[in-house]
A protein has these predicted regions:
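Glycine-enriched, solvent-exposed interface loops adjoining structured elements
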Residues: 1-213
Length: 213
């Protein structure tokens, strides 16, 4: 026999399952496909895919030379919280050979910090007008230039954090993911809850998380 779950516990497991569902659909693919390569995976996440245009941050303390910081959505100025990048572009500005200023839209290429030193010394991959590199730094995207141009705007399409489920205080706000995903999310919540019951070592961790939330 299993005990009845308190509303706070139900909220916890539903939100854990919802978050896991989104993260798995975005990243977990044994065939190494992106989530948009299958129609179901695209449909699963379409409600939490959004896009925004970001201007350079007022606070500029870039870590790398010629870096420009753009503040990622974190819920401070709106409800959206950035999770995963899908597509990135930027608008650069440079002075051409005639002394005129040119605005141009180009792609942005994500790199890892471990690869930075290698790429900046590579004549074919270092930052350039048509090769704008991007590092993540705390709550910022740091776009890298070669110093001959600046960046006016950062165009970001991304997966955002889904709205938190709260059956106690907001019972009228349903799961915002596509309707066909709801049964999978509930099933995932049930599975995790039952696994928690079967593994007592998780009980203290569960109580601690509920207290923190």
């Amino acid at each position: 026999n299993y005990p009845n779950f308190e509303p706070e516990e139900i909220d916890l497991w539903l939100n854990r399952s919802q978050d896991r569902f989104v993260k798995q659909r975005y990243s977990h693919d044994p065939k190494n496909e992106t989530f948009e390569l299958t129609q179901k995976r695209t449909d699963d996440l379409r409600k939490v895919v959004t896009e925004t245009t970001i201007i350079p941050s007022i606070t500029q303390t870039p870590i790398k030379p010629n870096g420009i910081l753009f503040e990622l959505p974190d819920g401070t100025l709106g409800t959206d919280i950035y999770w995963f990048a899908i597509n990135e572009e930027c608008e650069i500005r440079y002075e051409d050979c005639n002394g005129s200023w040119v605005d141009e839209r180009n792609g942005v290429y994500a790199i890892q910090h471990d690869d930075y030193n290698k790429l900046v010394d590579d004549p074919f991959n270092k930052p350039a007008k048509d090769v704008v590199l991007r590092l993540m730094h705390n709550r910022f995207a740091e776009l890298l230039t070669d110093g001959t141009f600046t960046i006016n705007k950062y165009f970001l399409r991304y997966v955002r954090q889904p709205i938190t489920l709260d059956i106690i205080n907001s019972p009228g706000i349903p799961c915002e993911l596509a309707d066909h995903t709801h049964a999978e999310i509930v099933a995932g919540a049930v599975t995790m809850a039952l696994e928690n019951i079967a593994s007592p070592r998780f009980q203290t961790h569960l109580i601690s998380e509920m207290t923190a939330e």
